[in-house]
Amino acid sequence: MARKSLIQREKKRQKLEQKFHLIRRSLKKEISQIPSLSEKWEIHGKLQSLPRNSAPTRLHRRCFLTGRPRGNYRDFGLSGHILREMVNTCLLPGATRSSW
């Protein structure tokens, strides 16, 4: 289980990213449309004045139950060992173990 502080930090980053998503997207769109270099620098300064944790690259996918940062399956939002336990105990409907 990950430390609770790390899980809370990740939740805080998700909230910030959602809050500034539209602003960040509009500023990036303006940069691509304006031909003047001096205006691009001004808009770039506005973009850099946004909080660092509001950037989508700062987010890290974590396991929904344990908060584990590695070995996650996107479809389920779970880490590998938790996914395996849940499939073995039939807690995930429709998931079957492969056999050949």
UniProtKB/Swiss-Prot annotation:
Binds 16S rRNA, required for the assembly of 30S particles. Belongs to the universal ribosomal protein uS14 family. InterPro entries: Ribosomal_uS14, Ribosomal_uS14_bac/plastid, Ribosomal_uS14_CS. The keyword Plastid applies. It is found in: Plastid, Chloroplast. GO terms for biological process: translation. The lineage of its organism: Eukaryota, Viridiplantae, Streptophyta, Embryophyta, Tracheophyta. It comes from the Eukaryota. One of its GO terms (molecular function) is rRNA binding. PANTHER family: 30S RIBOSOMAL PROTEIN S14 (PTHR19836), SMALL RIBOSOMAL SUBUNIT PROTEIN US14M (PTHR19836:SF19). The gene is rps14. The keyword Ribosomal protein applies. This is Small ribosomal subunit protein uS14c. Part of the 30S ribosomal subunit. Its main location: plastid. GO terms for cellular component: chloroplast; small ribosomal subunit. Signal peptide: none annotated. Keywords: Chloroplast, Plastid, Ribonucleoprotein, Ribosomal protein, RNA-binding, rRNA-binding.
